[in-house]
Every structure is written in structure tokens, then in C-alpha cells.
A protein has these predicted regions:
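C-terminal alpha-helix plus adjacent terminal tail
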Residues: 1-11, 77-78, 84, 88-109, ...
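Conserved CoA-thioester-binding segment of acyl-CoA-metabolizing enzymes
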Residues: 1-58, 70-72, 76-77
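Terminal peptide-recognition signature
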Residues: 16, 20, 35, 53, ...
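Residues at secondary-structure transition points
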Residues: 22, 26, 33, 113-127, ...
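Glycine- (often His-adjacent) and acidic-residue-rich active-site loop
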Residues: 55-132, 176-178, 261
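Crotonase-fold acyl-CoA enzyme core
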Residues: 131-247, 271, 275-279, 284-287
């Protein structure tokens, strides 16, 4: 890893830390690339059986680094020989990023519009990051130690379990800079809080403190700021000692059921159960149950 992302392996738990505390762990292109690499390493490493994502310093992640984004927007305008269209935003305005699924029917950006690097970060960076978390065949926990804004909140919502410090907060900041949701928020937020509440949080773009986030279902647990590392670490260690293949099957079922009807979900359950029934963990755990012993899961 580089200075932007830290990787620590403690037993079977990989901790991935966003490491730009001076910028509240805002997401630059470098950080996004390194984070995707860290997630890939966690997914492919047999010694890793649970993943913990957190932020260095006082923030979890402030979302897109708008200084970098504004620079890319300005570069796009300065490289175009045609002057900006009437009414176009001035150079550096952060309102031209085109999220995946946004209304593109209006056509391409006006002459002098933003550079592709500014427009394409959703498809090139954010979408792969969310898919890497959701498809990770291991539990992924977010330890939200401070503000999680915009894409930072999206990364937390993509995780399987979220534990927040008492002083943490969430902010659907997209509309504040003239954007709609990205980083999977249009998919995860309605499933966590309901469609109506998701619309409210996205449109009003007001901070949600950790206790309120717990009430809304955005997080699973809120703990004292000083207890976050210990509580999240203990949960990660517990999951790392569990039936890893079963956890992967659970994630596969939940992801599949989110886009399919009951009959298809039932068939997916049967398919996954059949595969898991052949695992060493299932057979050993069944034998341990009959002997009234505690099972010892090997993750396979």
C-alpha cells in the first residue's frame, strides 16, 4: 500500500485504513486506486477471513476530493478551444460530474465542459469499489470513526455491517454540489432506510448524527468514540473465526434477492445450501452439534 491507504493484517482480520487525515480522507484518484487494490488483495488472500474499513484521524471519509475534482474540471475547460456555452458553470465549479445512472439524455457536456477524468470517476473508480465490497466473499465491517460524506457514506453503506462512533455523522452531500447519488447510494440507502427517507436524506443533504443514524437503520451499532476500535476489532475477529464460506453464501443470497423475485430467491437459496452442504465447516459443525461440542470453523 502507499501512504494513502494502510493495510494491516492481525490474525485473519485485514484492516484497511483510508490514510489522508489532513484532508479528512477525501478520495483522490490515487486513494481510490489503492483502495481497490487493497480490497482485491483481501478478497484473494486465503489468510484473510474478515475485512475492517476505517479512516485515519477524525474522519471516516469526506467523499470526493473536491480540490482534485475542481482541478480536473478546470483542466477540461482550458484544453478546449471553444469558449463555454452561455450559462455554463465557471471553471472549477463542482457541478459537472456525471454519476452513473444520471440523466444523460441532454447530450454531451457543452463545449469547454469538464475533462473525461472528472466525468468518468464514477464508472472508473466508485462503481468498481462498491462492487468489490459487495462481492467480497468475506464479511466487511465499516468502523465509522467520524464524518462519512458523499462517496464516503456510500462506501460505508456498501459494507455488510456498520459500527459508528458516537461522534460520527453521515451526510448525503451530493445535492450540495449539484449532483445526484453515486457510490451505490441509490441502491443501498433505500434498502437501509426506505425509499421515502432516502429521498429526504439525499434532497435535503443534512447531517445525520450517529444516534439518529442508528434509529434510521443506517448503522448497526453506536459506541463511545474511545470504544470503536476495540468493539469493531472484536466483531471482526469473531467473524474471522466463523464459517467464511457460509458468510460468502449469505452475501451471495442477499445480493441476488435484491434484484429477483421470491421464486428465483428460493432457487438461489437451494443452490447455495447445496454447495455449502459439501463444505468441511458444515460437516464438522454438524458433527460437533451431535457431540454437544463447540464447532471450530476453518473457513472452507
Amino acid at each position: 500500500m502507499t501512504d494513502s491507504v494502510r493495510w494491516d493484517l492481525d490474525g485473519a482480520v485485514a484492516t484497511i485504513t483510508l490514510n489522508r487525515p489532513q484532508a479528512r480522507n477525501a478520495l483522490t484518484a490515487e486513494l481510490k486506486t489503492e483502495l481497490l487494490g487493497a480490497l482485491g488483495q483481501a478478497a484473494s488472500s486465503p489468510e484473510v477471513r474478515a475485512v475492517l474499513i476505517t479512516g485515519a484521524g477524525q474522519a471516516f471519509c469526506a467523499g470526493q476530493d473536491l480540490r482534485e475534482h475542481a482541478g480536473l474540471l478546470g483542466a477540461g475547460r482550458s484544453q478546449d478551444e471553444v469558449p463555454p456555452a452561455a450559462g455554463a458553470s465557471p471553471a472549477g465549479a463542482p457541478a459537472a460530474q456525471a454519476p452513473a445512472g444520471s440523466a444523460s439524455a441532454a447530450g454531451p457536456p457543452p463545449p469547454g465542459g469538464p475533462a473525461p477524468a472528472a466525468l468518468d470517476t464514477v464508472r472508473e473508480h466508485y462503481n468498481p469499489l462498491v462492487l468489490a465490497i459487495r462481492s467480497m466473499p468475506k464479511p466487511v465491517i465499516a468502523a465509522v470513526n467520524g464524518v462519512a460524506a458523499g462517496a464516503g457514506a456510500g462506501l460505508a453503506f456498501a459494507c455488510d455491517i456498520r459500527i459508528a462512533a458516537q461522534g460520527a455523522s453521515f451526510l448525503m452531500a451530493f445535492a450540495r454540489v449539484g449532483l445526484a447519488a453515486d457510490t451505490g447510494v441509490s441502491w443501498t440507502l433505500p434498502r437501509l432506510a426506505g425509499a421515502g427517507r432516502a429521498a429526504e436524506l439525499l434532497m435535503l443533504a443534512e447531517p445525520v448524527r450517529a444516534p439518529r443514524a442508528l434509529e434510521l437503520g443506517l448503522v448497526n451499532q453506536v459506541v463511545a468514540d474511545t470504544d470503536l476500535v476495540a468493539v469493531a476489532g472484536a466483531l471482526a475477529a469473531r467473524l474471522a473465526a466463523g464459517p467464511t464460506a457460509a458468510y460468502a453464501g449469505i452475501k451471495e443470497q442477499l445480493n441476488y434477492a435484491a434484484g429477483h423475485g421470491l421464486a428465483d430467491a428460493l432457487e438461489k437459496e437451494a443452490e447455495v445450501q447445496t454447495a455449502l452442504g459439501r463444505t468441511t465447516d458444515h460437516q464438522a459443525a454438524t458433527l460437533a452439534f451431535t457431540r454437544k461440542e463447540e464447532p471450530r470453523f476453518l473457513g472452507r
